[in-house]
Amino acid sequence: MAAAPPLSKAEYLKRYLSGTDAGLEGGPESGRKRRKKRPKPGGAGGKGMRIVDDDVGWAAISTDKLEKEEEEDGDLPVVAEFVDERPEEVKQMEAFRSSTKWKLLGGYSEDGHFHNDDQDPSPPRKARHDTPDASPPRRVRHGTPEPSPPRRVRHDTPDPSPPRRVRHDSPDPSPTRRGHDSPDPSPTRRVHHDSPDPSPPRRVRHDTPDPSPPRRVRHDTPDPSPPRRVRHDSDASPPRRSHRNSSAVSPKRGHHGSSGTSSPRQAHNHSPAAAQHRRTLDSSGAQHHRRARHDSPDLELPKAKSSKAAERPSSKTVSQSGLGPPHPSLSMNSKYEHDSDLSPPRKRQAKAHFGAKKQLDSKGVCQKASDSDLSPPRKNSKSGHQDSDSDLSPPRNRPRRQSSDSDLSPPRRRQRTKSSDSDLSPSRRSPRSGKKTPHMYSGAKTGLVADVQREHQELKKQDQDATDLGAQFEFTETVFRDKSGRKRNLKLERLEQRRKAEKDSERDELYAQWGKGLAQSRQQQQNVEDAMKEMQKPLARYIDDEDLDRMLREQEREGDPMANFIKKNKAKENKNKKVRPRYNGPAPPPNRFNIWPGYRWDGVDRSNGFEQKRFARLASKKAVEELAYKWSVEDM
């Protein structure tokens, strides 16, 4: 089949634009029939059902809306509008007051006026759990403006911003305590409902101005009011957790003396320390220094304190000292009113001291102001304040503690009341009077010349005694003692050892003779004697040799007619001698050990023939060896 001719671009474009009619009119494809496409099942034909599971997240919706709004705003014409140049706080307050989303308890009176008893410049805290607010806390950044509607707010503060849960580890230059008369630029936290409230009585905080009697105040604020109970150290740390209701661990504290974003922190519920940590220095600025707690922002250690056990001495101190009127809610909140910190001491900020080293309180007790003490205040019943710059208030009934600069040690026992500026050394024992006299660096005593001479004489005498003692025992003989402690005589021991060795050698020789055999030893000795005797004779033996003739005569020969005569003569000779009887019968068969039979043997062999077989085997073996030797040497 021939290939179709190629089409030009113009022709192809013409057919494409004209649709199917152009294809039918001309070209080789015009005669072909096109197949109808079948509609796919489940398509747009209306048959079946399609389920689309597409969950759109809130983040995507919010971003899409923002983008669309921006695009629409770009298309709209530019129109002059009213610009509200008021501060952000005022705008938020207006929006908060005009909003109906929030129901305030005790914040507004019936006439609609907002009771702002406490302008709080402090950063937000977490609300106590005894407040009737069930809204959840939000975790936000304190540096970004919050456009969301206000959340849980203090009932006595004009801040409509939402509460935040704050972090414990970012340094914060903003004030962290509640000021009494400075506007609040920082976002609010969950707060205590301690403003005038028609609701039932609650545990109130001691840092809000209320009609109760005055409490301790800060020692560096020119405050003519009666004393209030405050912390005497600029606390840069978040409130600690008590065993009961607060267990917040704050690894870092921010410095809260400069304006800026508020310090992130998470104040725990019912924290008694939060009530006393949040007080400002003066009443004019929005951000002022707090008096530092005896801890630095970075060296804070985790601590857990028992509010119940730690606050009872505080209430006792207030009632006994009588320097300030008692708080009406003292009986109810005595366990929350004072921060008796049992945590390890920390460095104190030198923020609120302003160079004051020593100051006298109303009773004239002088106490050193420790500029960089890191330890928390200890309970002390003595009056005396460490750091009061311009304190015009009456004397406070505040526990005095022993301040120690750069003190990182664990809390001391409360019996110690003396303050030491920078004494980190262990306690010294005072020299006992009358026991030791002072000495100079050379070691000599101080005093009269006669005493010095007497000392020299004593030293010389001691040296002489030591020399004499050394000379006395220089050439002495060493004394050896046994285990019982008695002296040992080495010479006598050597003699005893020698005698014992000789006796042992004799016994060994006797056992050696017995082991070799006495008969063999006697026979060997006899052979030696005979050999010596023969050596003394001439070289050749003759017939006239008496010894040779006797030996030949005593021999017994088989078949000798004179054998019986010889035996009888020997028997007669040996009759008078006491000799054991011996077998004298015919020659017995040989055995392995050459044992002679007893004198009563009758000559009958009653053995099993083992001895005879043994000797026959030995004889045959020897014969074979001789035959082999002869065969090996026969051709030589």
UniProtKB/Swiss-Prot annotation:
Phosphoserine modifications at: 135, 148, 161, 174, 182, 186, 212, 225, 234, 237, 258-259, 263, 271, 283-284, 296, 340, 343, 370, 372, 375, 409, 425
Modified residues (Phosphotyrosine): Y511
Coiled-coil parts of chain: 448-537
One Gene Ontology cellular component: nucleus
GO BP terms in the entry: mRNA splicing, via spliceosome
Subcellular location: Nucleus
Biased composition (Basic residues): 345-356, 429-438
UniProt function note: Involved in pre-mRNA splicing as component of the activated spliceosome. As a component of the minor spliceosome, involved in the splicing of U12-type introns in pre-mRNAs.
Region annotation Disordered: where it falls in the sequence: 18-55, 64-83, 106-469, 554-597
Cross-link (Glycyl lysine isopeptide (Lys-Gly) (interchain with G-Cter in SUMO2)): K65
Assembly description: Part of the activated spliceosome B/catalytic step 1 spliceosome, one of the forms of the spliceosome which has a well-formed active site but still cannot catalyze the branching reaction and is composed of at least 52 proteins, the U2, U5 and U6 snRNAs and the pre-mRNA. Component of the minor spliceosome, which splices U12-type introns.
Source species: Rattus norvegicus
InterPro entries: Bud13 (IPR018609), CWC26_splicing_factor (IPR051112)
Transmembrane segments: none
Residue(s) carrying Phosphothreonine: T131, T144, T157, T208, T221
Protein family per UniProt: Belongs to the CWC26 family.
Protein name: BUD13 homolog
Claim: Nucleotide-binding is one of the keywords in the record: no
Keyword Aminoacyl-tRNA synthetase: no
Compositionally skewed regions (Basic and acidic residues) per UniProt: 294-314, 452-464
Protein keywords: Coiled coil, Isopeptide bond, mRNA processing, mRNA splicing, Nucleus, Phosphoprotein, Spliceosome, Ubl conjugation
